[in-house]
Swiss-Prot record:
Species: Phalaenopsis aphrodite subsp. formosana
Subunit structure comment from the entry: The 4 large subunits of the cytochrome b6-f complex are cytochrome b6, subunit IV (17 kDa polypeptide, PetD), cytochrome f and the Rieske protein, while the 4 small subunits are PetG, PetL, PetM and PetN. The complex functions as a dimer.
Protein name: Cytochrome b6-f complex subunit 5
Keyword Transit peptide among record annotations: no
Gene expressing this chain: petG
NCBIfam families to which the protein is assigned, alphabetical: PRK00665.1
Record-linked SUPFAM superfamilies: PetG subunit of the cytochrome b6f complex
Length: 37
């Protein structure tokens, strides 16, 4: 039962982590793009 609970937590955290990394990379890319201009 605990294993299923941990598995659910991991499955819930993975998309959040990927989204956070994507947003951070996108904001850094936008900032670098503006600096070039």
């Amino acid at each position: 039962m605990i294993e299923v609970f941990l598995f659910g937590i991991v499955l819930g955290l993975i998309p959040i982590t990927l989204t956070g990394l994507f947003v951070t990379a996108y904001l850094q890319y936008r900032r670098g793009d503006q600096l070039d201009l």
